[in-house]
Amino acid sequence: MDVVWSATEVRSRRFRPTPVRSDQAELDDHFRWLRRRRIRGYFEVEIPDVESPQLTIGFRGEYAVVHMLAVAPVAQSFVLAGDGSVPNGAYVDLPVRDELARFTGEVVLGVYRAWDLVRAFLQTGRTAELGDWHAL
């Protein structure tokens, strides 16, 4: 199954918003490439030709944050609840596109757990099963 994604480039270390359509293996390879080089990264992913939301993942070190951008029936943004990898009162700076933003432990996940959830979304198209979403 194909996916559409935009991501941080390895060489420039900047987010490139131009979408790429590929199979999920190419997307996984790009994620692993960034992780191997310890580059902070940001992805926007969606399922092509289907009315589904877009997910984003920003990661740095061992932590990540996942957002959902829905357009139907009304444009809304959500952030996925954290997995306890960072205490609720603590915070982590994670990338949103090319800028770092501060997130509390309530919405921070372990990077590999977050990536597994993004992959699950791309396989099923469903977001409700990923966890609790908080409206922004």
Predicted regions and their residues:
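Acidic, proline/glycine-rich low-complexity IDRs
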Residues: 1-35, 67-136
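Amphipathic, interaction-prone secondary-structure segments
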Residues: 36-74
